[in-house]
């Protein structure tokens, strides 16, 4: 999968799905599934937005997009120049000149162009003019509510992981840096790994969780404690202390 973080990309007759894609949840995946039906290279356009908290970090989003069969992830920085474009400039420069879009798939609430002046009707009119088809998909509802990143953040933040996973479509996951700890667990013959997630990552409440951990292509079951280490002086950084079953290394 190609990962592009600027407009220096040249597609060729692509199927383009556009969205924020924080979490790439089940609603987002409807766009991806529709794009696959076009039998063309799939470009997923996402926008780099400074969020206080995100479901998935840029690296995690890349790994999930690749897993879902995306051919190119195009991350567009929302610069002042980019945001000042008219809807037609957006369609011409990004969808036509950069992606060479044959088809574009968006959600029903899609807005684009300066001041969010363009909507799905605008996009369909521009598609007719510029030569690409447009498919607009309704919002996915589960449990009587729209599936959204905001809803999933709330579920994770309150520890309702099974419900969050149902909306995500795959189990919530995280990546992080493994650091050498105080090795207190090793003295009790229960060595653990200390994993520190990105500071912007949405995390569940502090507590003990059952986990799966992938290590060098192999998956292990384990348990982890999420939180700080109040009994150890100077340890106040939030992290995961993970113990894996049947692991040595």
PLM regions and their residue ranges:
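Phosphate/ribose-recognition catalytic cores of enzymes acting on nucleotide-derived substrates
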Residues: 13, 181-249
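Acidic-and-aromatic substrate-binding clefts and catalytic sites of carbohydrate-active enzymes
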Residues: 52-53, 82-84
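Classical nucleotidyltransferase
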Residues: 84-191, 206
